Amino acid sequence: MPVLAKAALQQALEQRSGWTVVDGQISKTYGLATFPFAIEFVRRIADAAEEVNHHPDIDIRYNKVTIALSTHDEKGITEKDFGLADTIDRIFAAAQ
């Protein structure tokens, strides 16, 4: 899966709320009600990531979970990252 060109990357970001590029990865921070909710959210992300064999970087700070995605094999951002980003957004929406 090829790395997205700058224009395609910008277009993909514009179609998604809250995702930005940070240090060569797409990133988003989610706010959960409590620490246990944050941990459950991460558990669900882990299940989804395992299903597609694509694993995000995850940072947990109390009730805030930051996700960062890039395709390591391609050394950049690909459609695979946006596919998992969309899945994570759906997991978050279902948890609300």
Curated annotation (Swiss-Prot):
GO terms for biological process: tetrahydrobiopterin biosynthetic process. It is an enzyme of class 4 (lyase). The keyword Ribosomal protein does not apply. Its EC number is 4.2.1.96. InterPro entries: PCD_sf, Pterin_deHydtase. Belongs to the pterin-4-alpha-carbinolamine dehydratase family. This is Putative pterin-4-alpha-carbinolamine dehydratase. It comes from Herpetosiphon aurantiacus (strain ATCC 23779 / DSM 785 / 114-95).
